């Protein structure tokens, strides 16, 4: 298995925990803009690693995975600079749900419909007939 894909997978799991920590910190202590910005940038890094891994592996990926991930990144950056508690909690909580949905799209336990519709093979894939 591609090492970048493995890094993307495990790093993404860690990021879900970090996003949950941001939500809990915002709820109990108030928004921490430094932590919020760091987590948003870390998710950006994982997005880039995922894009590079996509072009280096022959694994089919559903289009829903990057769409949901990009929507989550947008919400993370919207909430990252905010000091408004409700905005931070809403943005980061919704981003967490979107990232879990993006994870479920390609996970073995995820819905089968996502694996059959809007699936894109990377350019490096070799299709055998």
What is the predicted function of each stretch?
Residues 1-129:
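Polytopic transmembrane helical bundles with strong interfacial aromatic enrichment
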């Amino acid at each position: 298995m591609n090492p970048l894909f493995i890094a993307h997978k495990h790093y993404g799991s860690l990021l879900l925990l970090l996003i949950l920590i941001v939500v809990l910190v915002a709820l109990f202590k108030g928004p921490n803009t430094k932590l919020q910005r760091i987590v948003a940038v870390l998710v950006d890094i994982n997005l880039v690693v995922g894009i590079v891994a996509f072009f280096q592996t022959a694994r089919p990926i559903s289009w829903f995975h990057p769409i949901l991930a990009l929507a989550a990144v947008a919400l993370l950056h919207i909430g990252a600079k905010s000091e408004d508690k409700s905005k931070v909690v809403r943005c980061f909580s919704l981003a967490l749900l979107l990232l879990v949905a993006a994870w479920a799209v390609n996970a073995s336990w995820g819905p089968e419909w996502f694996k059959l519709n809007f699936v894109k093979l990377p350019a490096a894939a070799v299709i055998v007939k």
